[in-house]
From Swiss-Prot:
InterPro entries in UniProt: Glyco_hydro_22, Glyco_hydro_22_CS, Glyco_hydro_22_lys, Lysozyme-like_dom_sf
Pfam families cross-referenced by the UniProt entry: Lys (PF00062)
Active site annotation, chain numbering: 53, 71
GO molecular function, one term: lysozyme activity
Organism this protein belongs to: Mus musculus (Mouse)
GO CC list: extracellular region
Keyword Magnesium: no
Protein family (similarity comment): Belongs to the glycosyl hydrolase 22 family.
Name assigned to this protein: Lysozyme C-2
Signal peptide region: 1-18
Domain of life according to the entry: Eukaryota
Alphabetical keyword list: Antimicrobial, Bacteriolytic enzyme, Disulfide bond, Glycosidase, Hydrolase, Milk protein, Secreted, Signal
Enzyme class: hydrolase
Keyword set includes Disulfide bond: yes
């Protein structure tokens, strides 16, 4: 009985963990989902962005005290403008989704919302991490040896 309980707890802890993508796995997933060159944003830009926003972690969150918003998921999409978490004052929800959808191992919803973000006039510049770590840099290392 004790072994069964231990096994059950182990399985529960495994299912509660985030998926952390490997760099090339993430690049290939983005390519399969039409992100290569989407609105002029290269795969290397997306991979660099996710590296610096979430370290490729699907369940990453970051609370922003200033405006009481939270950044969600592998792309750290903000609840002030893009998703609804039921907690952020004056949220816009431009992606029309619940923020919890951005924390799934299946990143389809996160990709769709990221596409919506780059269609906005700011484009990829909406992400502070992209401006700080990726803009005007050689990003070839982010997709090197990935076969994309």
């Amino acid at each position: 009985m004790k072994t069964l309980l231990t096994l059950g707890l182990l399985l529960l802890s495994v299912t509660a963990q985030a998926k952390v993508y490997e760099r090339c796995e993430f690049a290939r997933t983005l390519k399969r989902n039409g992100m290569a060159g989407y609105y002029g944003v290269s795969l290397a830009d997306w991979v660099c962005l996710a590296q610096h926003e979430s370290n490729y972690n699907t369940r990453a969150t970051n609370y922003n005290r200033g405006d009481q918003s939270t950044d969600y998921g592998i792309f750290q999409i903000n609840s002030r403008y893009w998703c609804n978490d039921g907690k952020t004052p004056r949220a816009v929800n431009a992606c029309g989704i619940n923020c919890s959808a951005l924390l799934q191992d299946d990143i389809t919803a996160a990709i769709q919302c990221a596409k919506r973000v780059v269609r906005d006039p700011q484009g990829i510049r909406a992400w502070v991490a992209w401006r700080a770590h990726c803009q005007n840099r050689d990003l070839s290392q982010y997709i090197r040896n990935c076969g994309v």
